[in-house]
């Protein structure tokens, strides 16, 4: 099998054009990830022949693949900050022999999009399931790993840096604002007393001790909100989302649609009000689209997903 990867430097990111002339009917590669709300995304984008679409959170390429399957002349530009996700996506689409995907490595808020470039845009926010399932990335408290949580391995700020060096007040504010954690002050106080922490499991155990025993073993782990807050802070997720929401409507052709999947209220509120207040967009979904019970049963991680759509106004 012969792969061609042509790269061109683009400020601090890389544009990667992936092509493969062999095995066009290759079966699905083993690393392909099935995203949430598949049919709802495809229906909402209203994909057109010869359209150009932006997958702003490429990951393992699940949504991109669904878009490309709609018509043989559809093209997709995919964005991802995670170098490991990019590498796996390269392998996936090369094995499938699909030449219609371009990948731009970087933060979606920094993408230099052109006015009217895309027929549609999709963004699936947060951490993907494969990232959670790789222990050494440090996103999950269910695996012992270093306190990392970086999407971009080249940046210096890690979860360990925050936990072990921020002052108590700053930690409490972080847990409350980004994790909506009501016990934020008590948790911050305990962590400052017990630090330094080196691993995810060590940190999760310390957080759990801030809760009454009967609340430590419920459906939602006591450390969930703190870990969410740390991940958001490490990767500037909300700041990046706000910048993306400001830029993305300009990249749509008239009538083009943008859909965003969020997984917690901090993201969803920003998407909701950005769509509502935009002078360029008409809201399509008055209420968010949520997974059907069958999908939640097959994929429990989908249960908190909310999908909102808006459409670019005519000129």
Curated annotation (Swiss-Prot):
Q: Which domain of life is it from?
A: Bacteria
Q: State the CDD domains in the record.
A: AdoMet_MTases
From the UniProt record, list the reaction(s) this protein catalyses.
cytidine(1402) in 16S rRNA + S-adenosyl-L-methionine = N(4)-methylcytidine(1402) in 16S rRNA + S-adenosyl-L-homocysteine + H(+)
Keywords from the named record = Cytoplasm, Methyltransferase, rRNA processing, S-adenosyl-L-methionine, Transferase
Pfam family, any one = Methyltransf_5
Q: Name one GO cellular component term.
A: cytoplasm
Q: Where is the composition biased (Basic residues)?
A: 301-315
One GO BP annotation here?
A: rRNA base methylation
EC numbers for this chain: 2.1.1.199
Where are the stretches annotated Disordered?
A: 291-315
User: Where does it localize?
Assistant: Cytoplasm
Can you tell me which residues bind S-adenosyl-L-methionine? 61-63, 80, 108, 124, 131
Where mainly found? cytoplasm
What GO terms are given for molecular function?
Answer: rRNA (cytosine-N4-)-methyltransferase activity
Q: What does this protein do?
A: Specifically methylates the N4 position of cytidine in position 1402 (C1402) of 16S rRNA.
Write out the similarity annotation: Belongs to the methyltransferase superfamily. RsmH family.
Q: What is this protein called?
A: Ribosomal RNA small subunit methyltransferase H
Which gene is this protein's source? rsmH
């Amino acid at each position: 099998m012969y792969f061609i990867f042509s790269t061109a430097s683009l400020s601090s990111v890389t544009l990667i054009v992936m092509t493969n002339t062999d095995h066009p009917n290759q079966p699905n590669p083993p690393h392909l990830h099935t995203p949430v709300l598949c049919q709802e995304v495809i229906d909402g984008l209203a994909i057109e022949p010869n359209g150009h679409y932006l997958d702003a959170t490429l990951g393992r390429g699940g949504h991109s693949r669904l878009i490309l399957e709609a018509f043989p002349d559809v093209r997709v530009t995919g964005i991802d900050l995670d170098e490991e996700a990019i590498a796996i996506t390269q392998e996936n689409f090369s094995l499938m022999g699909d030449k219609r995907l371009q990948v731009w490595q970087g933060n979606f808020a920094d993408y230099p999009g052109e006015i009217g470039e895309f027929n549609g845009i999709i963004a699936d926010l947060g951490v993907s399931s494969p990232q959670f399932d790789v222990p050494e990335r440090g996103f999950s408290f269910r695996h012992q790993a270093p306190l990392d949580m970086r999407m971009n391995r080249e940046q210096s700020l890690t979860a360990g840096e925050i936990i072990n060096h921020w002052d108590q007040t700053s930690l409490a504010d972080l847990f409350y604002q980004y994790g909506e954690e009501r016990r934020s002050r008590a948790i911050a106080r305990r962590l400052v007393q017990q630090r330094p922490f080196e691993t995810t499991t060590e940190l999760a155990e310390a957080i759990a001790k801030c809760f009454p025993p009967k609340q430590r073993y419920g459906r939602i782990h006591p450390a969930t909100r703190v870990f969410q807050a740390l991940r958001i802070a490490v990767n500037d997720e909300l700041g990046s989302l706000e910048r993306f929401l400001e830029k993305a409507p300009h990249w749509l052709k008239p009538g083009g649609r943008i859909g965003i999947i969020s997984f917690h209220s901090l993201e969803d509120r920003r998407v909701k009000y950005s769509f509502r207040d935009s002078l360029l967009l008409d809201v399509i979904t008055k209420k968010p689209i949520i997974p059907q019970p069958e999908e939640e049963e097959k994929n429990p991680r989908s249960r908190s997903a909310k999908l909102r759509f808006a459409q670019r106004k005519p000129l």
